[in-house]
């Protein structure tokens, strides 16, 4: 048997199941169009793109970082790829209101009113890794050693603007971390609404040990998430934090416990560590997609309004968002479904 995993969220106890029984969402559907963002085309895309059907309408988009030889370190090419993927989702929604941009042809065919493909609008985004040993190792320091000061400034500006664009997406965003997320890798995960970590995951902001500080949002996004004292501890010491501690700190929203095989099982496994990393990556991605699907069971307009309301909490914001949802077709459908004792079918209108 492979390593065992179990999901720890807000429930005190849950069932344990072998990772081989977990769904394999990334392999069950065809990968979307391959996109390249550098003059020299790599053997594989720097980001694997998979669209999974979302409940009600649209799709859940899965982006898997794919630079195995560099542990997904962020190079200029990978950053350009990520920026285009984020912007392709952002273009489906109004930058000011977060509402879907009307596209009647998709509305007619898929029930939503946005989207740049036949799969309809993107309802949620999962950011994961195609590399078992690393979620993201931060900036590509080997590449940056050859930068001029001007090139360094340009790279940082692009990095910060891309992270800000990810942070500003109006749909639910989830990071699936099953190994190491260091420096800019953790800062990338901090830009998503939710983070799913496995018990063997390691996260850190080690920049002070390199004589600098986090420069892509870590010093303001981390304190906002886990509090000033805890964030200061992580940033100033640069220490590594396990998945379990990250869950305790509030950095992880879901913790998937991955247990190593016992001695008998290990004897049948040529590389126990590789088997554990593989099981962990699959378990984290499965739970992230499950969370995305669970969220997408709700009304798309209501979900986006709720995200906006809690992002800038105030009575004024809540009132404004409530006014946005109260007169929608989805709201009427929910009332009708309740009366008819069935699940509502939301269309994002």
Curated annotation (Swiss-Prot):
Pathway: Amino-acid degradation; L-leucine degradation; (S)-3-hydroxy-3-methylglutaryl-CoA from 3-isovaleryl-CoA: step 3/3. Keywords: Branched-chain amino acid catabolism, Lyase, Mitochondrion, Transit peptide, Virulence. Disruption phenotype: Exhibits a reduction in growth rate and an increase in the number of conidia. Reduces virulence in host rice plants. Increases tolerance to NaCl, KCl and sorbitol but decreases tolerance to SDS, calcofluor-white and H(2)O(2). It catalyses: (3S)-3-hydroxy-3-methylglutaryl-CoA = 3-methyl-(2E)-glutaconyl-CoA + H2O. Homohexamer. 3-methylglutaconyl-CoA hydratase that catalyzes the fifth step in the leucine degradation pathway, the reversible hydration of 3-methylglutaconyl-CoA (3-MG-CoA) to 3-hydroxy-3-methylglutaryl-CoA (HMG-CoA). Involved in vegetative growth, conidiation and in the stress response. Controls mitochondrial morphology and mitophagy, which are critical for the infectious growth of the pathogen. It comes from Pyricularia oryzae (strain 70-15 / ATCC MYA-4617 / FGSC 8958) (Rice blast fungus). It holds the Pfam family ECH_1. One of its GO terms (molecular function) is lyase activity. Belongs to the enoyl-CoA hydratase/isomerase family. The gene is AUH1. Its EC number is 4.2.1.18. Its main location: mitochondrion. This is Methylglutaconyl-CoA hydratase 1, mitochondrial. Residues 1-37 form a transit peptide. InterPro entries: ClpP/crotonase-like_dom_sf (IPR029045), Enoyl-CoA_hydra/iso (IPR001753), Enoyl-CoA_hydra_C (IPR014748). GO terms for biological process: fatty acid beta-oxidation. It is found in: Mitochondrion. One of its GO terms (cellular component) is mitochondrion. The keyword Transit peptide applies. Disulfide bonds: none annotated. SUPFAM superfamilies: ClpP/crotonase.
